C-alpha cells in the first residue's frame, strides 16, 4: 500500500523564502531516499516533471516520495500518519461499476484571498495550499475512517486528531504498528481512497474521449493509478511495476492504462450526472462491509503487469466515481444484448434440453449392441421405490393374467351343437377368462404425463414366451418381485423372448427406457410426439415399426379414432408403446401362449402377430360397412318418401365410417411391403424369411380391404347421388300436381265472375227490367244467359287444353 504526500500551503506572499527552503529540503530528502532504494536493489522510476503544470508536478513528486517511504523500513524519527484521504484500495479490490461512473464538476471550496494569491504562484512539489488540506483523523483500529469535519465526542471508533508539521512529518496513531499492516487494513475501504482528490479526476477513453481538463483534473486519476501501482509492488515484482507506473503518469495527455479505460463509442458527455456521494461520517465497519469495497479479483488478472489486464466496462474509484449514460438511440442494442445474455443463460442452465435433441450424440455403449443397460433400470426402479416409501398411501400393485383361448375379432355365425364337447369347453374357458380383468375401463385422451396412478392402475405389462402369466404393474419398479433387486431376473434368457408393453409412458420413463435399451433419439422423438405416419425404420440393434389402429369401443366418444402403436423390435424381445388402452397386446399374448408349442415365438413373430391383430380388427368393421352399403342401395330403389330423412342419415354415417377406415388403412400395405422386402434382402436386424411369408398374407388382406372400402365409397357416393336425384324428381311431381289443382280452382273462379255480377245487379235497390210483369220470363232468360256463358267458357278451355 502506498500513500500520497500531502503538501502544506504557502502562508502568504511574505513566506517565499520559507517555501523555497522547505522545497529544497523535501527535494533533497526525496532524492536521498530514491538513491538509498536504488542501492538496495529496488527499482525506482523518476517521472517527468513539467514546469508548466505545478499541481501535476506536485502530485508526481509526492507519489514518488511516498513510494520510496513505503518500500523503505519505517524509521523511529520520521513516521507517517495514514489519513483515509490517501487510503487507496488494492488493485484486486478495484472494480469499475457502471452505476458510479458519471463525473460532475465538484463543488469548489471557498478560499480566502490570501490563499488564492498563494495558489497562483508556483509552489514546489513538496508543498501545497493549506486550504486544500484539512485536519485529518485516523482510525486506530482499521486506519480507513477519515473525516474532514470536527470529530464528535460521542462517536465511537474514531481516530485521534493529527496535524501535519511543516516538515511533512505525520504521526502514526496508536494501534498501527506497521505501514504494511496499515495498508492491508486500509485496502478494503475504497470509498475513502480519493477523498483528497475530489474534483481533480479525468476520464479518458479509447473510443469517445471525455477531456474534462488538461492539467488540473487529470492529475487525480494518474496519481491514483500510480499509487495503486505502487501498492501492488509490495506483493509482486516491483521492477516491472515501477517502470509501468512511471510511464503511465509521465504526461497529462496520455491515456490511462487498459484496465482503467472505458470503450464508450456511443456515449455523450451531456448525459453525465454525478452519483450520490456516501456519507462522510460512515463508520469503519460499514466501510469494510460495503459490497463495493471487497471485490474478488478475477482469475485472469495479473498482479505483476497492469498493462495485461483485460479491459473492463465499469470502474469504481472510491468517491470520485463516474457514470456514463448511453444515448437513447443505443437503447435497443443494449436491450438486444440483455436478451441474448438471458437466452445464453437459459441454454446453459437447461442442459437436459440439449441432451434430448435428436442430433445429440449417443453414448459409446449405445453404438455397440451390448444388450440392456440393467444398471439404468435398477437405478430408476430404486428411485421409484424410495418415492413409494415416502408416500404412505401408495402400495405396490401387481396382477397376473391367466391364459385365455385366442378368439378372432369376428364372430363365428355357424351353428353349434350344444352336445359338442368342444363348444362346451370353449364356453367354460370363456367364463373363466371373463373373471380375470384383462382390459381396464379407462382411457387417456391425447398425450399426457401420468401424475396419479389411480386412473391407470396397470400401465406396464411384461410377458415372457416361456411363462404362463403376464405381470401387470402401475409403475416400472413394480414389475420386480418382492425379493428381486435387479431387472436381470426378468430379462433373463431362460424365460424366453420378453415383451414389455408401456401404456402412456411419462417423459422420465421414456428417457430411462431409451437409455437402457439404446434406442436412437429419432425413435424416441417419434414416440414422444406421437408420430402419425406409418413407417418402418432399421437401426443398428433394432427396427422400428409405427402402425396405427383405432378405438374399438362403440360406447366411447372417440370411437374409431386413430390409435398409434409403436413397436421396437430387438433380437431378444420387443417394446411397445401406445397412449390409449387397446386390446391388441392381450390378444397377441393369448395367441402366443396357445401356439408356443407349435411355432417358434420370437420377437419378429410377436411383431407380426401384433400387426396381424391390428389388421384383423378392421375386418368386422369392413364387413359391417359392406352390409350397410348393400342395404342402403336396396332401400333407395324401394324406399318410401317418408323415410327420406332417415335414409340420408344412414348414407352419411356409412360414408363417414368408410372414409375413416380408408384413411386408417391407406399406406399400411406399403409399410408391410417394405418390411417384407427387408426380410428378403437378408438384413441382420430385419425379420426372418418365414415371417416374410406371413407379412405377405397381411399385405394381401390390407390391399383387399382397401379396395373394398374404395368400392364401398363409390357405391355410397353413387347411391347418395341417385337418392338425391330421386328426391328431386319426387319434389317436381308434387309441385306439378299442386299447380294443376290451383289451375282448376282458378277456372272455377273465372266462370263464377259473371254470375256474381248478375246477381249483384239484381240484388241492388234500383229499378230492374221486368219488375212490373207477373211472369218469370225475365228470370229464366237471365239464368239461361249465365248458363250459356259458362258452357261457352268450358268449351273454349277444353278446346285449347288449358289444364
UniProtKB/Swiss-Prot annotation:
InterPro entries: Alr1-like (IPR044089), CorA_cytoplasmic_dom (IPR045861), CorA_TM1_TM2 (IPR045863), MgTranspt_CorA/ZnTranspt_ZntB (IPR002523). GO terms for molecular function: magnesium ion transmembrane transporter activity. Coiled coil: none annotated. This is Putative metal ion transporter C27B12.12c. It is a multi-pass membrane protein. One of its GO terms (cellular component) is plasma membrane. It comes from Schizosaccharomyces pombe (strain 972 / ATCC 24843) (Fission yeast). Keywords: Cytoplasm, Membrane, Phosphoprotein, Transmembrane, Transmembrane helix, Transport. Pfam families: CorA. One of its GO terms (biological process) is intracellular magnesium ion homeostasis. The modification Phosphoserine is found at residues 318, 449, 452. It is found in: Cytoplasm; Membrane. Residues 105-123, 152-166 have a biased composition (Basic residues).
